[in-house]
């Protein structure tokens, strides 16, 4: 975010944030993609 070099406890927080965001965003995007596909594949 901002220029704050006095934060030595930022590495695990950023890693955990990255894991949490991607761990939730990837299945969510896949789920929305499946729902959108189902909307278009109505027989």
Curated annotation (Swiss-Prot):
Tell me the keywords, alphabetical order: Chloroplast, Electron transport, Heme, Iron, Membrane, Metal-binding, Photosynthesis, Photosystem II, Plastid, Thylakoid, Transmembrane, Transmembrane helix, Transport
Q: Where in the cell is the protein located? A: Plastid, Chloroplast thylakoid membrane
Q: Which residues cross the membrane?
A: 18-34
Its GO CC terms? chloroplast thylakoid membrane; photosystem II reaction center
GO molecular function terms listed in the Swiss-Prot or TrEMBL record:
electron transfer activity; heme binding; iron ion binding
Q: How is the cofactor bound?
A: With its partner (PsbE) binds heme. PSII binds additional chlorophylls, carotenoids and specific lipids.
Its chief place of residence is plastid
Presence of keyword Heme: yes
Q: Which superkingdom does the taxonomy of this entry point to? A: Eukaryota
User: Does the record's keyword annotation contain Oxidoreductase?
Assistant: no
Query: Entry's InterPro entries?
Result: PSII_cyt_b559_bsu, PSII_cyt_b559_CS, PSII_cyt_b559_N
PROSITE patterns in the record, alphabetically?
CYTOCHROME_B559
The membrane topology noted for this protein in its Swiss-Prot or TrEMBL record is:
Single-pass membrane protein
GO biological process: one example: photosynthetic electron transport chain
Q: Give the residues the record marks as binding heme.
A: 22
Tell me its cofactors: heme b
Similarity-based family: Belongs to the PsbE/PsbF family.
The record describes the protein's role as:
This b-type cytochrome is tightly associated with the reaction center of photosystem II (PSII). PSII is a light-driven water:plastoquinone oxidoreductase that uses light energy to abstract electrons from H(2)O, generating O(2) and a proton gradient subsequently used for ATP formation. It consists of a core antenna complex that captures photons, and an electron transfer chain that converts photonic excitation into a charge separation.
Q: How does it assemble?
A: Heterodimer of an alpha subunit and a beta subunit. PSII is composed of 1 copy each of membrane proteins PsbA, PsbB, PsbC, PsbD, PsbE, PsbF, PsbH, PsbI, PsbJ, PsbK, PsbL, PsbM, PsbT, PsbY, PsbZ, Psb30/Ycf12, at least 3 peripheral proteins of the oxygen-evolving complex and a large number of cofactors. It forms dimeric complexes.
Name of the protein in its database record:
Cytochrome b559 subunit beta
